[in-house]
């Protein structure tokens, strides 16, 4: 069983000089505006740390959280940072501001050696959006041998049973389906525990 022993806010940053020192492995969580990043982070960590914005595209900071995970089965306790990046793909953000943040976003992803896992949240109802395809291509182009990319589908509970089954069978791997808030869980779909185990496995594969 994976238990989140501690989770707290570290800092917010809009440039590399404001980012905390790279002292521990980190996972990046990114996705389109309103894909459910804040909800996912808060549920994953068991604490209301990430704030949801009522206005898509409003969040313009990279938020850093320190987390301590305990794997009770293997008697292992380890600390990771979670980085919540600004949502992308919202058309009403001014072009100059959007360009500025995309520059910081990709600069952060390309130079920060402590990043070990990219978690790309994708709305399960909209699997073929060009912005998500481009984001995936950009991330995978940046990947070092000690890094991993993982798709995680949100809004799974908005699909009917046939759509859920089809997504589970056909989604490109590696992927997870966020069923944390799904009431009628089937044993074949991930639970919160399986999501945590999977992320911990990725992070421990290539420690800092």
Swiss-Prot record:
Keywords: Cell cycle, Cell division, GTP-binding, Magnesium, Metal-binding, Nucleotide-binding, Septation. GO terms for cellular component: cytosol. Mg(2+) binds at residues 38, 59. One of its GO terms (biological process) is division septum assembly. GO terms for molecular function: GTP binding; metal ion binding. Residues 23-205 form the EngB-type G domain. Pfam families: MMR_HSR1 (PF01926). SUPFAM superfamilies: P-loop containing nucleoside triphosphate hydrolases (SSF52540). The keyword Transmembrane does not apply. GTP binds at residues 31-38, 57-61, 84-87, 154-157, 182-184. Its cofactor is Mg(2+). Belongs to the TRAFAC class TrmE-Era-EngA-EngB-Septin-like GTPase superfamily. EngB GTPase family. PANTHER family: ENGB-TYPE G DOMAIN-CONTAINING PROTEIN, MSS1/TRME-RELATED GTP-BINDING PROTEIN. Necessary for normal cell division and for the maintenance of normal septation. This is Probable GTP-binding protein EngB. It comes from Helicobacter pylori (strain J99 / ATCC 700824) (Campylobacter pylori J99). The lineage of its organism: Bacteria, Pseudomonadati, Campylobacterota, Epsilonproteobacteria, Campylobacterales. The gene is engB.
